[in-house]
């Protein structure tokens, strides 16, 4: 049976911008693989037991921004201080949404988009 989440796969077009974004969230590159036969690169990043598998590939269609399609909607990362993470992102040049309280838990949270428009939720 399922023991936990193994990794999150992200398809990205902007290598430097994508790495900088996830590094601002504390992720570090742990592996890098170039696949000439597929004309892409896979970069593994880790932070707090969470692994991102970032596929850098040009030529894919851009993410549909709305209306939301069925399937995976967003990725949510748990943090101890959402306001502090939001400030780090702002200082790093990103534009997170306003800090708000989760409707059900009352905990602080916000959304920000990665360089390819993937919604990322930061949640206490």
Language-model-derived ranges and their functions:
Residues 4-14, 33, 42-44, 63-124:
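Vicinal oxygen chelate
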Residues 30-32, 38-41, 59-65, 98:
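A short, acidic/glycine-rich surface segment
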Residues 38-39, 55, 105-106:
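Short secondary-structure capping/turn micro-motifs that flank functional sites
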Residues 48-52, 59-61, 82-83:
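Short, charged/polar surface micro-motifs in flexible loops or helix N-caps
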Residues 2, 10-51:
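Core segments of cupin and vicinal oxygen chelate
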């Amino acid at each position: 049976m399922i023991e936990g989440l193994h990794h999150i796969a992200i398809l990205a077009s902007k290598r430097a911008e994508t790495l900088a974004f996830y590094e601002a969230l504390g992720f570090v590159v742990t592996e890098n693989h170039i696949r000439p036969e597929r004309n892409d690169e896979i970069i593994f990043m880790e932070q707090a037991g969470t692994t991102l598998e970032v596929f850098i590939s040009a030529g894919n269609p851009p993410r549909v921004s709305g209306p939301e399609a069925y399937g995976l909607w967003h990725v949510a990362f748990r943090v101890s201080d959402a306001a502090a993470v939001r400030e780090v992102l702002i200082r790093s040049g990103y534009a997170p949404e306003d800090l708000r309280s989760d409707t059900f838990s009352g905990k602080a949270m916000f959304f920000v988009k990665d360089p390819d428009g993937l919604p990322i939720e930061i949640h206490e």
